[in-house]
């Protein structure tokens, strides 16, 4: 797999240039000025070549390609669907558009709010962006989650620029789909500025049984779908998954220098409890604890990287959830929990396992709570009814995973026409 890290490559180039000079000093090599100048020129050319190559290999996001989408936005009333992740370098998309005299009339904000600091599921009121004065229309204000007719009449085109993590129960894509539906209904255009999927290198999990459709499961896709938001938007249109089989007028600005084997490391945490790549990689396996009494580390420095409960026994690791920004009232608040720390697992081991239900099975068997362990939210997260049944029957994680293997292969074939990037 290709790991995309431009800063690392640039640092290596600088170090290479310094090492050339140090070699001569360390070995007391005396060269006349002409030879030294030629050697330094050669080193400069080589370093410049390596730097150009590093720049060519760097993933270029959709929002960075302003020459591609500025003409589309000319003379349009613009709404954006974004949050704190919608950055172009050190500036937000909103600021870039306003600096270039575009008419931004509204911001639609997802779960966690426009600034990305609200708790999971917390109601966030609509407001006004203090810096720019642009109205923020919250999709998580406790109402329908779909924008009103009045808000839809304000703009001509919706620009989507938000970092997703590629999981069916991560809510940003569901908010995007609701906006696509509204845009289809009111004949508004949609422009997705695509971003890499940090979990885009594999597909895993059961396809959602649509009787469990909810805010944490909006489409008939596996838990780990392996698609970018741009690809997913194209699939929503192509498969006519919007209500009443509607389609919207959709344009996608794809990333450059990106494939589904590019392991893209996010420069900004996408939400308060996914603070780093380890949390993002373990999220597909540990999120199910949200539907149990077990703590998954909210209120600690290791959210989604640990799990435990005050009554779990036989473990050497323990932690105590606290009230912190982004997790004001976490499960098992203030209680000493005993359990497992997964944060020391290598990324490679996590990728090899994919979705690993052994953690949930371990806690279920240890606590011996039977029907009191799972809440109905579990089916909304996993997307089917057979997983809970198989766990209660004593089946292993491998046996359960074998059950959804056909779902994974079916979806890979179904999604293929909509992929923008090499698998």
Language-model segments: which ranges?
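Conserved functional hotspot residues or short segments at active or partner-binding sites
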Residues: 303, 307-405, 423
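Short internal beta-strands
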Residues: 105-111, 193
